[in-house]
Amino acid sequence: MLRILTLSILATSKLASAHVVAWHPGMYCLGGNDTSVDDPNTNLAVNPLWDLPKSKWWFQADRGCDKAPPVDGVFLELPAGQNFTTELAHNRAQTTLSFNGQYAGEWPDGKDHPEDWSGTGTPPGCIQDDGAIHTNNQTMAGGTVFAISYQSDMSQVTMENLVVFSVLEHTPWKRIATYEVPADLPPCPDAGCICAWGWVPQGCGEPNMYMAGYKCKVTGSSSTKQLAQAQVPKYCANDTSECVGGAKQILVMNQADGNNVVAPDNDFVAYNEKWGFQNGAQNDIFM
């Protein structure tokens, strides 16, 4: 009976909101926005951000996620010069963080799909059986990023001190997502840093955006380098000399205020080379 009930809840929650976030024990809203309750079936953190004032979209304040930190002492650990893994899924229940991982599969929805999964037609249209990943195929997935601020208090994090340090091209795609960490990323303060995950879908569905928060800390680092101030990315597909190098901000679009980019004619906003983001660790973000 319990398994039937659980499956029913999973099906209902997926239909209600089937989007994606990077799940990890160090995230805000891991168990929902009530820290007295650990909801193994929550999808609150996956919901997109659209037409909101900055006071609401910033770290998902619209749903109270900015007030729901992870358990004390739990961090997203960032091993300098190495990599870390998160789980991209529509619901916490579809990860290894709930129900002993029994509903976690190779893909974000926990279902089976072909390795060359794509929409129909030539060129392929949007994938219709799971629009939650907002893409036509893997190569057209918009890319996701992690950014870091060397502030321990979220109220002190700004667009200028939140720097993208890792890019994973052609994601979201499969559930397991591994991001590279710059070797020179310095240690965090004793209370840790604040990190953010970002994604702007490249077409296929509403042109919204995603941002989630994490308590994080850099491990295995003795670097004394400092991060440069994050600059606004610039579309540079037609002229690479126009690309913004070095430390960059997350992409913000289609909000009521606080936007830093707009979609170019006949193209998309995305974390890719067209916007100056190279895949992997961002090793040029230091002063």
From Swiss-Prot:
Paired cysteines (S-S): C188-C193, C195-C216, C236-C243
One Pfam family linked to the record: LPMO_AA14
Example GO molecular function: metal ion binding
GO CC terms: extracellular region
Keywords: Copper, Disulfide bond, Glycoprotein, Metal-binding, Monooxygenase, Oxidoreductase, Secreted, Signal
Cofactor binding, per record: Binds 1 copper ion per subunit.
Alphabetical list of InterPro entries matching this protein: LPMO_AA14 (IPR054497)
Residues carrying a glycan: N33, N83, N137, N238
Signal sequence coordinates: 1-18
UniProt subcellular location: Secreted
EC number: 1.14.99.-
Cofactor field: Cu(2+)
Highest taxon, organism lineage: Eukaryota
Annotated family: Belongs to the polysaccharide monooxygenase AA14 family.
Entry function: Lytic polysaccharide monooxygenase (LPMO) that has a broad substrate specificity with strong oxidative activity on pure amorphous cellulose and xyloglucan and plays as a bifunctional enzyme to decompose some specific network structures formed between cellulose and hemicellulose in the plant cell walls. Catalysis by LPMOs requires the reduction of the active-site copper from Cu(II) to Cu(I) by a reducing agent and H(2)O(2) or O(2) as a cosubstrate.
Protein's name according to its UniProt entry: AA14 family lytic polysaccharide monooxygenase A
Source organism: Talaromyces rugulosus
